[in-house]
Amino acid sequence: MWRPHLVDTARLKYLGIVDALEADIRAGRVTPGERLPPQRAIAEALGVDLTTVTRALNEAQRRGLVSAQVGRGTFVRDEPAGDEGGGTPLDLSMNIPPQPAEPDLRRILPQGIASILTSPRGTLAMHYQESTGAPADRTAAASWLAGRVAGASADRIVVTSGAQAALFALCALLLGRGDVVAAGAVTYPGLKAVAAQQHLELAPVAMDEQGILPEAFEAVCRERAPKLLYLIPSIDNPTTATLPADRRREVAAVARRHGVLLIEDDPYAPLRSERLPALAELAPELTWHIATLSKCSTPALRIAYVLAPNAAAAVRLATVLRSSVLMAPPIFAALATRWITDGTLTALASAIRAENRQRQSSAASIFSGLDFAADPDGHHLWLHLPQRWRAAEFADHAERAGLAIVPASAFAVSPHPAEAVRISLGIAPDRGMLEEGLTQLSGLLTQPAVGSRAVV
C-alpha cells in the first residue's frame, strides 16, 4: 500500500501530496489497481487536515492518476495519464455557460430533435430554407426578443448559424476594405478575427468600469471617422462592464450625430436580472442587434437572431448569408423555436443564471482582496494582476499548472492593454473543480513573477 509523503518543493501542501503520489506511480512503487489508504489515514500520516487530502485526491483524479469507487475507496488507475503537463488542463478560457442539472441538455437536446423529426414539421426541417429563416422561426425569434427589444418584428429578423457567422456577414454587408470600426479598447476576439480577414481597421475607444466612454467615442468619430461601432452593452466580454441606461442614450446620440452604424452584440442580456434599453430601441435606424442563444443555452445550438433596422435591410443581410453559409441549420432553428414556445429556453436561461451566481459567489470568496470585475449573472470575470505580473506570463504559468486562462492581449485593440486576464467560470464540470482551479490561480498570484522561458 502507498506510503503517504509530500514533495517539499510544491507550492501548496495538497499539490505536494499529488506530486508525491504521481512520482511513486511513475516509478512503479505503487501498482495499477492498488487501493490507497483511507483519507483520514493519509491526513494523520502527513499531519494535515482532511480537507487537504480531499483536495489532493480530487486533483489526482483530474490528472487521471486514480479513480474513486463509492463504498470501496480510491484506486490507482490501470492507465494513468502519461502527459508531462500532469493531466488535462482545467479550461477556464472558453466562455461557455455552465450546463445546469435541470433542464438536462444531454436529455432534452436529443429528445427535442427526435420530437421535431416525428412532427409535421419534421420533413421541412431537413429541407433547404430561406436565408432569412423560416417564417415560424422568425416569429418565434420576435417573441424571444420582445422582452428585451421593444418593437422587434419578424420581418426585421434574420435567423443565422451563430453570432460569429452573423458578425462576419454584417461586416461584409456594411463595410469595405480599409474601413474603420470603433470598438472598446479591449473587445471580443471574434471581431478582431473578422477585421483581419476583411482588412478592416479597428479604432480603440477608451473604457471605464461601466464600458465605453461616450466622450471617447465622440473623439474617435472626429479623428477616425468610423463607419461602425461594435459593442457588447451587457456583461461585456471581457471586462464584464454593463453600460448604464444614460450612457446608452449618450452613445446612441453620438452615433446619430456622426452617422455611425451600430452592431449591438447582446449574448448575455437574457441572463441579466435587470432590463436596460437596447441600442436597437434607442437608435433603431442605425442598429443591427445580434442575439445568440449560445450563452443562454448551449453553444451546440448554433442559432443567433439578427434584428435589422428594417425589413429591407434584413433581406440585404440574407443575400450575403446566401453566398456564404446559405442558411441557418434548419433542425436547430426548429428546435430553438420549440424551446421558445414551450418555455424551455427561458428555463435554461434561468437555470444558467442561478448557477452563474453560485460560481461567481465562489470566485468572489476565493479572490477576496484581489482587483477583479464581475457581474453576478455572467459566467466570466476580469482579473487585474498585481504589478509584478504581466498577463501573458501569468497565463503561461497558469497553463503550466494545468489551468487555461486568456490574457488581455487576446482582446486588445489598443497597443498597451491592462495587465489582466479573463477567467471563464462556466466550462468547469462542477463547482468543486472550479473552486480548486480558482484556488490554484489565487495561490499562483502570490508567487514571485519570473520569466516563463529562457532567452538565449
Curated annotation (Swiss-Prot):
Keywords: Aminotransferase, DNA-binding, Pyridoxal phosphate, Transcription, Transcription regulation, Transferase
DNA-binding segment(s): 39-58
SMART domains, sorted: HTH_GNTR
Cofactor requirements of the protein: pyridoxal 5'-phosphate
Keyword Hydrolase: no
A biological process from GO: biosynthetic process
Record domain HTH gntR-type: where: 11-79
Alphabetized InterPro entries for the sequence: Aminotransferase_I/II_large (IPR004839), HTH_trans_reg/aminotransferase (IPR051446), PyrdxlP-dep_Trfase (IPR015424), PyrdxlP-dep_Trfase_major (IPR015421), PyrdxlP-dep_Trfase_small (IPR015422), Tscrpt_reg_HTH_GntR (IPR000524), WH-like_DNA-bd_sf (IPR036388), WH_DNA-bd_sf (IPR036390)
Name of this protein: Uncharacterized HTH-type transcriptional regulator RHOS4_30730
